[in-house]
Structure formats: C-alpha cells, structure tokens
C-alpha cells in the first residue's frame, strides 16, 4: 500500500483499528473516520508510535448527510490529492429483538448506518477514486446464514441489501480503475458481536486482528483477484 491513501470507517472499532494499523504498516496514509474523537486520538498515537502519521476525521454516520460526505471527499482531495481505498468497517447493531418489540428508530438506524451511509459515502468518494490507477472499495459484511435468522432486524436486512449494492457497484465499475469487493470475516470478538452472544457461550470468535491482513490484501493490487466477489475468510480459534 506504499503511497496509497486509505479511508477506514469505524476506525476505532475492533476490526477497523486492526485494519488501520495493518494498512499503515503496509505503507498507506490512513484516514481514521469514526464518531468518538477520544478513541480516534488513541489510535492515532498507536499509529504514530510505529512511525506513520494518519489523519483523523470525526463523523457520526447516524446523522451525517450526503453534504457531509461530499465535504469529506473535498477535504481529502484538497489535503492529500488522492484516494486509493475505502474500507467500510462502521456498523450498528443494538441486539437481538423481535421486530414487533423493536423501537422504530432502532430499525431505521440499523438500515441507515449499515446500508445507506455506506452508499452515500461510496457515492461521494467514487469521483476521486476513479482518478487513481487502481483503487478499492471494500465492504466488510456479516454472514447471511447467521443474520438472516430471527431477531436480527434492521441490521440483518441491511446485510442482505449490501450484497445487492456491492453487485450493482461492481457492474458499474467493472471496466474502470475502482475495484469493488466484500470481506466476510469469521466470528470476531467485538462489541457488536457481544450484543448477540455472551462471552461465556462464544467459543468461535477470534481477535479481529486476525483479519487485518485480509483487509490489506483487498485494498492492495492483489485484491483484484476478488473483484466483484465476497471473500469469506475464516480464522480458527486459538
């Protein structure tokens, strides 16, 4: 990733922070996007300690508008002049609840953060990404066999819809410099997963850092092998 500029959403989260660290170690200039500045600053310090200088961009996807994403793309262009990759790690899940008992706002939030916000951000970044010789738009996705079951609500619905968005975007970009791909990691020990499984009963989950290298692969030229597909990666518990 030497010389590349990569935007990571949900950068303060489990996979987002691990992927940001790995992308930075691989030579990328990393833009850390998240809604909690204090956590982003801690991650900034970790990256700076390994000799790189990331950028922080606090933004809450829940309330961000298309204009906010356009402003982000304009700032990236003005300050860095390029954008070679976007890694969509940001996600929102409030727990397993029957639909009829779920707050309507929670349903809307699950659909928005996990689908609409990703579409809006991609839409804003694509013009700048098309100027690169090779760029990657990567969606981190959940396992449909799991989230297609009862009680997953707006989050589960958004996961299904993202596959359609990915396929549509791939069809639009297949002959250009922007590669679109998905990454479906195995179970990870994250705050999101903890809302569905207790630690005591969760024997499958692994450290999100186990999937950081897969993120780098998809962002790098080697990711062309996965163009238009969802790469299902599995890491066995240790």
Language-model regions: role of each:
Residues 175-178, 182-183, 190, 198-238:
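C-terminal helical subdomain
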Residues 12-13:
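Conserved glycine-rich cofactor-binding loop
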